[in-house]
Amino acid sequence: RNNLGGQAFWSLGGLFLVDTPEQRRLGIRDSHDLALQDWMGTAGFDRDEDHWPREWAKAYVAFAAGEKRGWLQAMGHRLFPVVGWAERGGYDAMGHGNSVPRFHITWGTGPGVVEPFERRAREHAKTGRITFKFRHRVDALDMTGGAITGVSGKLLESSSESRGESSSRTETGDFAFKAQAV
């Protein structure tokens, strides 16, 4: 209950965005094509089994260059007017890393990233669209016909520890949930 948002809460709040007003204001020239070239150069997809990771990368870069910023803004997310250069790469966009700054820092850092999502999730919980299952440790994913159709694991005893404090790992039972898709 006290840790909704997980590790994102503790983060600096940096988000990968492409060709934004913040970048343009700082004179950073970016584009979908450049970001995709950087991503593909870093990932080094070169095997048959890289097909779906490659497709995911293409979709994510398209999202980051398109609707991601507006979608986040519509939920109340705000950015600092600076852009950092995490995972800095070469300037030629041919190797590992970002060839231009793309690390947009959230106003409020990690808690600022979590807040709009937490608010939205809690609203859905009030209407029954989401059911939170705190203190459930997932140990296995169940597959049927190549799709994940369930999760199972251990129930942990209740804990009222504050965020960042160690909580009990004492197991009190088992659980399993099934669905058409998880």
Question: Which role fits each region the language model picked out?
Answer:
Residues L12-V61, M75, F80-P81:
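Glycine-rich active-site loop/strand segments that organize a redox cofactor
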Residues R1-L12:
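Glycine-rich FAD pyrophosphate-binding loop
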Residues A8-F9, V18, E22-R29, A86, ...:
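General "foldedness" signal
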Residues G13, K178-V182:
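Conserved acidic residues
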Residues W10-L12, L17, P21, G112, ...:
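A broad "ordered helical/assembly scaffold" signature
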Residues A57-E165, R169-F175, A179:
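Conserved redox-cofactor binding core of oxidoreductases
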Residues N2, L15, E22-Q23, D139, ...:
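Short, glycine-/Ser/Thr-/acidic-enriched flexible segments
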